[in-house]
């Protein structure tokens, strides 16, 4: 809908492979394979590469650079208060040993959003704290340096049931990394055996 609405000048769709490594560091081959699967899923949902720019996060080195600078604008205490980070840490049983890359992924997401001057970011309800944290980073950056970054707005699905899809295990959210999802490429038999 977004790519065809005419409301937005450009649409950027990211395949977040670098972020996927934050909780799959032991399995880089899985992340590599998921790049292809996610791209195919995007296109099977109707994303048109002629209308939307689909890119791979790790191929844009400037995103890492921007993340590095943004890290100085966010405190550890602020990251610890982020409700999305808290719930993700619990879901992945990282309480005792949180990988730094995983802990700081909200800062990386802020880079992913602001690098492209995104005005609108489609998210589920669980991602609202991430957008809020991005807005805080933008505000602080613009105040300290120069008013050059855009404060993005969240775009939630109109259907409230789509704002947070539960996993097939009934817990948390549906997620590839949690292994509790149905893939668009799943056969009918695969879907039945997952129930």
Segments and roles (model prediction):
Residues 86-195:
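Active-site cores that bind ATP or allylic diphosphates and position pyrophosphate for catalysis
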